[in-house]
Amino acid sequence: MSEFSQTVPELVAWARKNDFSISLPVDRLSFLLAVATLNGERLDGEMSEGELVDAFRHVSDAFEQTSETIGVRANNAINDMVRQRLLNRFTSEQAEGNAIYRLTPLGIGITDYYIRQREFSTLRLSMQLSIVAGELKRAADAAEEGGDEFHWHRNVYAPLKYSVAEIFDSIDLTQRLMDEQQQQVKDDIAQLLNKDWRAAISSCELLLSETSGTLRELQDTLEAAGDKLQANLLRIQDATMTHDDLHFVDRLVFDLQSKLDRIISWGQQSIDLWIGYDRHVHKFIRTAIDMDKNRVFAQRLRQSVQTYFDEPWALTYANADRLLDMRDEEMALRDEEVTGELPEDLEYEEFNEIREQLAAIIEEQLAVYKTRQVPLDLGLVVREYLSQYPRARHFDVARIVIDQAVRLGVAQADFTGLPAKWQPINDYGAKVQAHVIDKY
């Protein structure tokens, strides 16, 4: 929304000093809406006191209020709206007692919220985005051309501040109104489902699809123009980077970028939230149908049992043979019966089960080198161990031997910076490069 130049304490003191207050019961709000509607039909935007009284009479009849005091109550309502700064009253000495009334910006804002902004229009949004795109392009071109301070204020800052920012605020307001409409649709769906869900299914589907379509139209229109708008904002931002005195333009561009990002991201998030609600409603309807179907069956069965002696009936049931489950999980439970007894050459023991045991044995055997202070040639030791195991386990055994060996000590030759020789450790081409461990 538009930024405020005053602080919170200043705004509070200002509102208290001017005694601002708004009180609009439903009949007064209806009167204000009637005034705005009639005012929109006039070219001059002005209304006389007699026309206001006529509008109040229509509202009074709609609320079934007495007509005897219509003049007094209309006068009180008009004075109250003037006091609340919803109407401006203009009088002249030549036409005493014949005042002219005009809606104030506050009155227009309230009536716009309830009348003009309630309907979403893709065409209106497209026109707004088209105007914004044109303004941003002209501002970006002016920013790249450069100029004095007056040039930046008139051709860059002013269009961004008083045209682009206001349209962004209008689009943001449209999204917030869509949020309210979504909540109203949710309330309508809840009321329909509470009354008669069978008759409400078609109405719920219509409300859900219409709202989903409106949200998607809004988001598609925004995303189609979003990249172009961001590109022009970046052009302006790049043009201000070399000017230290244009911080006010740079700050405004940053605010506009944030607004545009917020508008587009909230549009997508709103769609995602509505999709979740749509699924929830459909799940509720399916559950209601299942529950109602079971309830009808139980009711019919209970009624048949109660009237059995008057209307006998027979119950026929079928019991099919059970299907055997041949999945792999079931076969694993009786593995011996299926595969039989394996020969010794095919028996397999998972390596992880003996890893700790093997590591302990190797650690104990290698500890002899440390105890006797005998140099440990890693290539020879690994080759000796690998000769005791099948080829499939060579890699794992070699890793265990090397891990245990390096824990015992280091090779002084490592500090010379010279590489060690490669030594074969099995008959299949595996080699290791390591100096002799001689310092424990």
Curated annotation (Swiss-Prot):
Keyword terms, alphabetized: Calcium, Cell cycle, Cell division, Chromosome partition, Cytoplasm, DNA condensation
Region named Leucine-zipper: 208-236
Pfam families for this protein: KicB, MukF_C, MukF_M
Molecular function GO terms recorded: calcium ion binding
Main location per the UniProt record: cytoplasm
Single Gene Ontology BP annotation: DNA replication
NCBIfam families: PRK05260.1 (NF003615)
Subunit structure: Interacts, and probably forms a ternary complex, with MukE and MukB via its C-terminal region. The complex formation is stimulated by calcium or magnesium. It is required for an interaction between MukE and MukB.
Protein task: Involved in chromosome condensation, segregation and cell cycle progression. May participate in facilitating chromosome segregation by condensation DNA from both sides of a centrally located replisome during cell division. Not required for mini-F plasmid partitioning. Probably acts via its interaction with MukB and MukE. Overexpression results in anucleate cells. It has a calcium binding activity.
HAMAP family recorded: MukF
Descriptive protein name: Chromosome partition protein MukF
